[in-house]
Amino acid sequence: MLIKMDERIILGSRKLYSGNITVRSDKYYLGDKVVEKEIVEHPDSVGIIALDNKGNIVLVEQFRIATKNSLIEIPAGKIEKGETPEDAARREMNEEIGYSGKLTPLFQCYLAPGYDTEKMYFFLASNLKISKKRLTQDEDEEIKVKRIKLSSALEKCISGKIIDCKTIAAITMISNSKINW
């Protein structure tokens, strides 16, 4: 199998694992060398920057087994099959923080492009309202909702109290935006 991508020739790909994620090994030319790289295929995801009318951001704190720590994060989650990014953002906002609101697309980025296919779509959620029917959290989630001033959230990013990269990117982006939210 030869596939030409961005002036790179992919010689082959083989699946190493398949479950909630897939791990594959791609073999390709890099200049005159043949390189093999393991790639995680992960569904795309959404991140929500939920701001209330008092200048607070709604964050979540949850234990993350991979880090063996509780992290402070923006509400986020994977896009399920058949969902648009906006549908997923509405669902995740309801599940994780119990709110609905107006969603505005902000930006997209790859989270770990050196080895992972996941792209995250970020949304601003404004005009927040308590959800009439709150969805159940995922079975691996135990979430505490935190509402703090956006300026305090930025300070927590700078001081190292917030260490989740998607959250740092989102808070930095919204804090440095010239648009009045």
Regions inferred by a protein language model and the residue ranges of each:
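Short loop segments at secondary-structure junctions
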Residues: 31, 52-54, 63, 126-130, ...
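Unchanged
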Residues: 46-47, 79-165
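Long hydrophobic alpha-helical segments typical of transmembrane helices together
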Residues: 161-181
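Conserved Nudix-box catalytic region and its N-terminal flanking loop in Nudix hydrolases
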Residues: 2, 40-42, 47-91, 139
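Acidic, metal-coordinating catalytic segment for phosphate/diphosphate chemistry
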Residues: 11-47, 53
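A short, amphipathic edge element
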Residues: 2-14
